[in-house]
Swiss-Prot record:
This protein's encoding gene: CAPN2
Binding site for Ca(2+) 4: 292, 299, 323
Binding sites annotated in the UniProt record for Ca(2+) 2: 229-230
Residues involved in Ca(2+) 3 binding: 89, 91, 96, 175
Record-level GO BP terms: cellular response to amino acid stimulus; proteolysis
PTM-bearing positions, type N-acetylalanine: 2
Molecular function as annotated in GO: calcium ion binding; calcium-dependent cysteine-type endopeptidase activity
Full protein name: Calpain-2 catalytic subunit
Domain of life: Eukaryota
Amino acid sequence: MAGIAAKLVKDREAAEGLGSHERAIKYLNQDYEALRNECLEAGTLFQDPSFPAIPSALGFKELGPYSSKTRGIEWKRPTEICADPQFIIGGATRTDICQGALGDCWLLAAIASLTLNEEILARVVPLNQSFQENYAGIFHFQFWQYGEWVEVVVDDRLPTKDGELLFVHSAEGSEFWSALLEKAYAKINGCYEALSGGATTEGFEDFTGGIAEWYELKKPPPNLFKIIQKALQKGSLLGCSIDITSAADSEAITYQKLVKGHAYSVTGAEEVESSGSLQKLIRIRNPWGEVEWTGRWNDNCPSWNTIDPEERERLTRRHEDGEFWMSFSDFLRHYSRLEICNLTPDTLTSDTYKKWKLTKMDGNWRRGSTAGGCRNYPNTFWMNPQYLIKLEEEDEDEEDGESGCTFLVGLIQKHRRRQRKMGEDMHTIGFGIYEVPEELSGQTNIHLSKNFFLTNRARERSDTFINLREVLNRFKLPPGEYILVPSTFEPNKDGDFCIRVFSEKKADYQAVDDEIEANLEEFDISEDDIDDGFRRLFAQLAGEDAEISAFELQTILRRVLAKRQDIKSDGFSIETCKIMVDMLDSDGSGKLGLKEFYILWTKIQKYQKIYREIDVDRSGTMNSYEMRKALEEAGFKMPCQLHQVIVARFADDQLIIDFDNFVRCLVRLETLFKIFKQLDPENTGTIELDLISWLCFSVL
C-alpha cells in the first residue's frame, strides 16, 4: 500500500516538472545550497552522513572491509593531498581522467567523451565549484537516472593509499573534478565496487539522458552511413575507437597514425563526386589534436584535387586541430566500434537539428504476477507487461529504396548496480514486438492472451537476451499497430524497468492493459423462493436464534471442505468468515439469516467450481499465474497493477493461492466494488471520502 501511494505522489510530481534538468530531484533529499550554507555559517567542512568515509563505501567483495586491496586506505580531502587543489583547470580534458584501482574504464571512456561537449559537460558537472571561494568541502553533480535528472551531493573526502588517489585522478594530480564525479556516481550506485564492469553506453546515457546504440564495424549494417548522417543531423554524439588486444596496445599508434584504445569523435559524413564516382567520406576528430591520419583523404592527400573546388572548400574550411577526413571504407577497415548517443529533444538547445520524438514508459516485473519470462515459458509469457506502439508516418527519405517508420527501442532495468552489494546483479532481459491483429486494431484495453502468443510469432525482437543494464535495437517497420513485450529470460524475477522509444516521426505509445470490470451476479430472491430442503438444513445449522455467526460459519465450512478430495484446504480462517458475513449482513447484526446464507452458499459453490476448473494439473491448489484467469471466470477484469497487489496479498511463498485465500480475495473484491458503485451512482469513476469513511472501508 505504501508503495502504491509513493508511486502516485511521484507521478504527480513528475507531471509538475520534477525530475527535469532544471528541477532535478535531490538525491536522498540533500539540498546542496542549504548544506553548503550551513557549513559556511558554522565554519565546518561537510561530512556526508549518507555516504560516509568508511569501508562499506568502497565495496563489498574485492574492495570489501577485509580485502587486502583496502588495507592502509585513508580518506583525505584534496586540501590534504596537494598544496593548491583545483576543481577544474582550463576546461576538461582527457588528461584529467586517469584510471585507478577500479575496473570502471567503461565509465571513464564515457567521461572522456563528455569532455568533447562543453554544454553537456556543464549539465553534469556544474563548473562554478571551487576549493577557494565559498569552499565548504561539498560538491554536487547531476546524473540522468531512468527518465529523471538527479542531483547528487558528496563531501570531498577521497580514498587514498600512500598519499595518492586510489581511483580516478588527473595526470598532474592537482585537478579533482573527475575524482569527485566518480565518487558521486559511486554514491548513487551504492559503492565504488558497484562501478566495476559495464558498457560505455551506460555512462553515455547517465551523462546525457540520451539513448545509446553501438555497432561492431567488422559487421556493419548496410545502411550504416545513412544512420551516421541522420545521427549528425539530429545532434547525436558519435564516438569511435580501435580495439586493443593487449595492455601494450593501449595508446599504441598505427603506421597510419591512428591511436588504439583512444576515443575519437565522428563530426561529419558526406558523399562527394570524385573522378566520376560517388565517394563516401567520414570526418573524424582526435579531441587532443596530437596525431592525425596519414592515409587517403588526409589533409595533404591528392584525392582532394579530384573533387569540385567549391566542394573541397566547403568540406575543409572549418577545419579544427586534430580533425581529418577519411573514406568510409577505410573507416570500417581501421576502426572497431562506433557508438551513437542519440540526444533527447530537451538536451538539444539549437533549432538547427532535426530532433527525435521521445516516449518513456515505466513498468515492473513482479514474481507470481507480471514476471512471465521469455517465449520459452508459454504458460506465463503473456502475463508480462504489454505496450502498444502505433506507427503512423513513414520516414521522409527512404533508405536503399526501403520505406517504413524508423524507431529505436531501449529497455533498461533499474537500480541493479545498487543491489550488487545485496548479492543481486543484472537480470538477463530482452523484448519482442508483435503485430496487432486486424480484429483488435484500435483497442488499448485488451491484454493479449496466452492463445495469441501461442499462434503468433514476433515481427521483430531484441538481438539477444543479455545481462546488461540496457537492451537496445533499431527497427524499421511499416505503419501499423504493434505490441511490445519486455521480459526477463526466466520467469519470477522481480525488477523495475523503463522503456524508451525514439522515433523519426511522431508515434503513439502506451501501456496496454485490461480495464477494471466487475460483472457481479445479482440475487433477486425472497425467503419464499428457497426450497424446503435448504430451509431444514439452515434450521439445523443455525440453532435457536435462526442466524449464523462468523464463528458458526467457520465450523460449518470446515466440515464441508473436509469431505472434498479435489480441493486441498484446512478450512476457512475466521478472518475469511468475518468478511463473508460482512459482505451479506444487510441488517448490521453481524450474522446471516436464511436468505443471506442461501446467497453465500450459492457463491461458495460457484467459487469451488471455478477453483476446480482452473486447477488443470489437479493439484488441489492454484498457482498465482492461474489467478488471473480465475478472476475473469468470477467476473472480474483487472489491470496488471492490481494483479500484483492481489498476488502479494493472497499468495504464499511458493506462489500458491489456497481455497481460503481465493474466496477471501473474491469476497473482498465484490464488497469493494459494491461500496464504490453505491457511492458513485452516476458511474463517474471517482468518489470522495472523508478520513473516517476512508479508514472504515480500509479495515474491511
